[in-house]
């Protein structure tokens, strides 16, 4: 059997996949990702764990001088990162840590993080996430939540008394 042929195993070549590119309106955030798990058949909206896959794998490329995403945390998701090439830094709850090729780090649910490339060449990372059902994400700098239903939505609210609207 050749590459990609069915034997119960799925195979893709990441060099043949088209990266998803993004940039924020003012250009502060930019990046591109190769969604390996989705190319292997992962169905992110499914609640069937066989269709969702137990984890998601991405190759994330961050251009020089950019961060791919705002500073954020996840309500239930773990994320593992491995720097494949380039260098940069990661902002986290305790400060900022420099990263270089070969470094790996993990963030558990509730730990805010943001990667940025302070080098002159692209920073490339492998990202592995467990993508649990019911995940939401929080952006501490802008005090808003991201929720996946019905589509990705961002919301912001002010603190309310526990009984507000109940009596």
Describe each PLM feature range:
Residues 39-45, 58-74, 109:
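Conserved short histidine dyad/triad with adjacent acidic residue
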Residues 109-135:
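Ligand-binding loop in jelly-roll beta-barrel domains
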Residues 70, 91-93, 116, 126:
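Beta-strand residues in well-ordered beta-sheet regions across diverse protein folds
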Residues 1-54, 136, 141-167:
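A short, N-terminal "cap"/entry segment at the start of jelly-roll beta-barrel domains
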Residues 33, 54-59, 112, 122:
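Conserved beta-strand residues within beta-sheet cores
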Residues 54-55, 59-63, 73-92, 129-130:
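Short, conserved beta-strand element in jelly-roll/cupin
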Residues 94-109:
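Short acidic-glycine-tyrosine-enriched beta hairpin
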């Amino acid at each position: 059997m050749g590459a990609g042929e069915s034997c119960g195993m799925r195979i893709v070549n990441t060099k043949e996949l088209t990266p998803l590119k993004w940039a924020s309106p003012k250009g502060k955030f930019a990046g591109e990702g190769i969604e390996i798990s989705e190319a292997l058949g992962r169905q992110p909206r499914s609640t069937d764990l066989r269709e969702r896959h137990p984890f998601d794998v991405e190759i994330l490329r961050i251009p020089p001088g950019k961060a791919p995403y705002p500073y954020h945390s996840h309500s239930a998701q773990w994320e593992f990162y491995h720097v494949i090439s380039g260098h940069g830094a990661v902002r986290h709850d305790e400060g900022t840590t420099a990263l270089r090729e070969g470094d790996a780090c993990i963030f558990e649910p509730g730990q805010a993080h943001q990667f940025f490339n302070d080098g002159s060449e692209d920073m490339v990372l492998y990202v592995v996430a467990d993508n649990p059902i019911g995940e939401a994400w929080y952006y501490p700098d802008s005090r808003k939540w991201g929720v996946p239903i019905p589509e990705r939505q961002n919301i912001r609210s002010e603190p309310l008394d526990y009984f507000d609207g109940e009596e």
